[in-house]
Curated annotation (Swiss-Prot):
Assigned EC number: 2.7.2.4, 1.1.1.3
Family annotation (PROSITE patterns): ASPARTOKINASE, HOMOSER_DHGENASE
Catalytically driven reaction(s): L-homoserine + NADP(+) = L-aspartate 4-semialdehyde + NADPH + H(+); L-homoserine + NAD(+) = L-aspartate 4-semialdehyde + NADH + H(+); L-aspartate + ATP = 4-phospho-L-aspartate + ADP
Organism superkingdom: Bacteria
Positions that bind NADP(+): 468-469, 501, 549, 573, 658, 661, 791
Molecular function terms from GO: aspartate kinase activity; ATP binding; homoserine dehydrogenase activity; metal ion binding; NAD+ binding; NADP binding
Pathway info: Amino-acid biosynthesis; L-lysine biosynthesis via DAP pathway; (S)-tetrahydrodipicolinate from L-aspartate: step 1/4; Amino-acid biosynthesis; L-methionine biosynthesis via de novo pathway; L-homoserine from L-aspartate: step 1/3; Amino-acid biosynthesis; L-methionine biosynthesis via de novo pathway; L-homoserine from L-aspartate: step 3/3; Amino-acid biosynthesis; L-threonine biosynthesis; L-threonine from L-aspartate: step 1/5
Quaternary structure, from the entry: Homotetramer.
Residues at which NAD(+) binds: 469, 498, 549, 791
Name of the protein in question: Bifunctional aspartokinase/homoserine dehydrogenase 2
Cofactor binding mode and count: A sodium ion is seen in the structure; a metal ion may subtly affect the relative position of the nucleotide-binding region to influence enzyme activity, and could increase the stability of the enzyme.
Lineage: Bacteria, Pseudomonadati, Pseudomonadota, Gammaproteobacteria, Enterobacterales
Region (Interface): 253-463
Keywords from the named record: Amino-acid biosynthesis, ATP-binding, Kinase, Lysine biosynthesis, Metal-binding, Methionine biosynthesis, Multifunctional enzyme, NAD, NADP, Nucleotide-binding, Oxidoreductase, Sodium, Threonine biosynthesis, Transferase
Length: 810
């Protein structure tokens, strides 16, 4: 087990802030506000040097050896900048103390420069901006009432000098643990970018070293999440400065992020992700200027990739070309060079392999090309090395992109007429790259983004359940399919119809208007495992499970559906009303994989009750109570029941008309109403268990088991009981209704109540549902939603509504 895997500090998080997030007084105060809102005591911060401090230090260092007057001017600019920051953020007495410490540092660094520059002096001077940032940020947090301490990472991070220094986890871990226990309950502000070698010298951690040190420190400290705050909200589908309709990606697979970083995207660096790969850390990218405007979370998700997620480009790349002599084995030479580059940790962005010309081409950014060329030159391999500059690169990144024929085709289409030097795809199929002889690439990236991401997506739909609701939805979908596609820009394909025993499946799509007729003749018996394998191998951009069953077995598969990247639209209430632990697991699984679980059809059929409750909560309201008639079936029964027809005969009529659940006892038992109440209460933000609801069942105990026919044949007891209750209510001038109630104190019940004839719950049309929402905003005059709450048409319409909503989310 690695040191990282052993580290453990449950709940602790780490926040990293870059130089642009600490550029001035306002920025520091904004960061302090973020820490107040988004962090807890014992959380950690890693900070970069403020603003352009690092560049100023490099300038000062270089000029100190050639132009002492200019060096002094840079030093004074740096001094004014840091002193202005300190004075603008702290009270005079505390500011004086920090300014004194800063001036002392500056004088010591100046003395170092006078004695000459070597690697150790360079690192000591250039890495000092982080020390000043951490010291000042700690003081600002304390001033804001957030107990904090600062920590110089050189006290525990151990790394030896190299082109890409690697932190020695074995040496660093115990040193950090000793320091962590010394500051209980405080936010620890740690310097980024710097470490120390065994000789006691400062070692810089290289390009993007602060981000790398943040994830490395987070892994050593055992944090649950590292959030990198910068001036962008996360990873976009393209550079938003080049592509105006680029969209923020809320979730990115770790392998996709790693490939994007390998391709030198500015928002990510490959070394930043190394500690994430070897630990259980979740990595989040967020904007410090607009923290509530979305983010990108990088996780180890199970959802299968189906194509490109990002297009990226570079307008300044180089090619190192190696001409293998005709007398040498070309494949052997390629293998040897590949091993040399891997050992030196300078992997190329792309490789051009030209067997016919005995030519190898290695693509690098201009910053890395000279180092790679030097490494290959020093290797002394037989052959000719040369460097070509001024080339460009475009790439598509996404798990499965090279296996997506549509995306590949559009990539090649966009490259037509372009000066392509060579194309390349990564071994794991996550990227497709083209190196161009000339740039710029902006118009090419715009066209590629438009072609890949705004073109029509194919959405596969698999319908589980072909009874009343399923058959009616098929009719509705057949009518609306073309309109839906035109409105959303997606192609919706009915890929399958499944019942409890058989399935009719086709990747090419089924005709919804004739699917049921074909089902009877062509459906085959299929076990659960083979059906699941068929679904996992789907060719669509997204697959949606439509669950219009009342099956517990299917509800139990929602976790698997989420983990394999399927969306679920449900009229089945069993998952939404399961115990809290299972319910949270399902919700978390869909959130983690970036898939959606929509269930508007579970309550109120087509009425927008779930949406309304969710909108009130999201807008800042608090739900105090919810009451009403939640069952269109029971609404119809109690409005029809006047004593002239036996109650069970009315139940039979409702069953024949498709107004009830497949087993009408599910309605009469109150379980269906209870599930709706639990779903609504949870939507309102309350943690309620199904067994907390007091339920009055109308099903006699001796009829709970057995067949439906047995229930209808033995309904005398229920009929007699209902007549007695009806007569008792009439004597008081009241009417009977089956009512559900829940309040903020956790009291919940469903059952028969006698209410006044002028009560909102009394004056209904048959099959109507009524929902009365009392909230902080609607305390004196409850918000009432009323309308048809049972029947095939309205429930099928609710399923269709959620398909529309899913299209918007996608």
């Amino acid at each position: 087990m690695s040191v990282i895997a052993q580290a453990g500090a449950k709940g602790r998080q780490l926040h990293k802030f870059g130089g642009s997030s600490l550029a001035d007084v306002k920025c520091y105060l904004r960061v302090a506000g973020i820490m107040a809102e988004y962090s807890q005591p014992d959380d950690m911060m890693v900070v970069s040097a403020a603003g352009s401090t690092t560049n100023q230090l490099i300038n000062w260092l270089k000029l100190s050896q050639t132009d002492r007057l200019s060096a002094h001017q840079v030093q004074q600019t740096l001094r004014r900048y840091q002193c202005d920051l300190i004075s603008g953020l702290l009270p005079a007495e505390e500011a004086d103390s920090l300014i004194s410490a800063f001036v002392s540092d500056l004088e010591r660094l100046a003395a170092l420069l006078d004695s000459g520059i070597n690697d150790a002096v360079y690192a000591e001077v250039v890495g000092h901006g982080e020390v000043w940032s951490a010291r000042l940020m700690s003081a600002v947090l304390n001033q804001q009432g957030l107990p904090a301490a600062w920590l110089d990472a050189r006290e525990f991070l151990r790394a030896e000098r190299a082109a890409q220094p690697q932190v020695d986890e074995g040496l660093s871990y115990p040193l950090l643990q000793q320091l962590l226990v010394q500051h209980p309950g405080k936010r620890l502000v740690v310097t980024g970018f710097i470490s120390r070698n065994n000789a006691g010298e400062t070692v810089l951690l290289g390009r993007n070293g602060s981000d790398y040190s943040a994830t490395q420190i987070g892994a050593l400290a055992g944090v649950s999440r590292v959030t990198i705050w910068s001036d962008v909200a996360g990873v976009y589908s393209a550079d938003p400065r080049k592509v105006k309709d680029a969209c923020l990606l809320p979730l990115l697979r770790l392998d996709e992020a790693s490939e994007l970083a390998r391709l030198a995207a500015p928002v990510l660096h490959a070394r930043t992700l190394q500690p994430v790969s070897g630990s259980e850390i979740d990595l989040q990218l967020r904007c410090s200027y607009t923290p509530d405007q979305g983010s990108t979370r990088i996780e180890r998700v199970l959802a299968s990739g189906t194509g490109a997620r990002i297009v990226t480009s570079h307008d300044d790349v180089c090619l190192i070309e190696f001409q293998v002599p005709a007398s040498q084995d070309f494949k052997l030479a390629h293998k040897e060079i590949d091993q040399i580059l891997k050992r030196a940790q300078v992997r190329p962005l792309a490789v051009g392999v030209h067997n016919d010309r005995q030519l190898l081409q290695f693509c690098y950014t201009s910053e890395v090309a000279d180092s790679a060329l030097k490494i290959l030159d020093e290797a002394g391999l037989p052959g000719e090395l040369r460097l070509r500059q001024g080339l460009a690169l475009v790439a598509m990144v996404g798990a499965g992109v090279t296996r997506n024929p549509l995306h590949c085709h559009r990539f090649w289409q966009q490259l037509k007429g372009q000066p392509v030097e060579f194309t390349w795809q990564s071994d794991d199929g996550i990227s497709l790259v083209a190196v161009l002889r000339t740039g710029p690439t902006e118009s090419l990236i715009q066209g590629l983004h438009q072609s890949v991401f705004r073109a029509e997506k194919r959405i596969g739909l698999v319908l589980f359940g072909k009874g009343n609701i399923g058959s009616r939805w098929l009719e509705l979908f057949a009518r609306e399919q073309s309109t839906l596609s035109a409105r959303t820009g997606f192609e919706f394909v009915l890929a399958g119809v499944v019942d409890s025993r058989r399935s009719l499946l086709s990747y090419d799509g089924l005709d919804a208007s004739r699917a049921l007729a074909f089902f009877n003749d062509e459906a085959v018996e299929q076990d659960e495992e083979s059906l699941f394998l068929w679904m996992r191998a789907h060719p669509y951009d997204d697959l949606v499970v439509l669950d219009v069953t009342a099956s517990q077995q299917l509800a139990d598969q929602y976790l698997d559906f989420a983990s394999h990247g399927f969306h679920v639209i449900s009229a089945n209430k069993l998952a939404g009303a399961s115990d809290s632990n299972k319910y949270r697991q399902i919700h978390d699984a869909f959130e983690k994989t970036g898939r959606h679980w929509l269930y508007n059809a579970t309550v109120g059929a087509g009425l927008p009750i779930n949406h309304t409750v969710r909108d009130l909560i999201d807008s800042g309201d608090t739900i105090l109570s919810i009451s009403g008639i939640f069952s269109g079936t029971l609404s119809w029964l109690f409005l029809q029941f006047d004593g002239s027809v036996p109650f069970t005969e009315l139940v039979d009529q409702a069953w024949q008309q498709g107004l009830t659940e497949p087993d009408p006892r599910d309605d009469l038992s109150g379980k269906d109403v209870m599930r709706k109440l639990v779903i609504l209460a949870r939507e309102a933000g309350y943690n309620i268990e199904p067994d907390q609801v007091r339920v009055e069942s109308l099903v006699p105990a001796h009829c709970e088991g057995g067949s439906i026919d047995h229930f209808f044949e033995n309904g005398d007891e229920l009929n007699e009981q209902m007549v007695q209750r009806l007569e008792a209510a009439r004597e008081m001038g009241l009417v009977l209704r089956y009512v559900a109630r829940f309040d903020a104190n956790g009291k919940a019940r469903v059952g028969v109540e006698a209410v006044r004839e002028d009560h909102p719950l009394a004056s209904l049309l048959p099959c109507d549902n009524v929902f009365a929402i009392e909230s902080r905003w609607y305390r004196d005059n409850p918000l009432v939603i009323r309308g048809p709450g049972a029947g095939r048409d309205v429930t099928a319409g609710a399923i269709q509504s959620d398909i529309n909503r899913l299209a918007q989310l996608l």
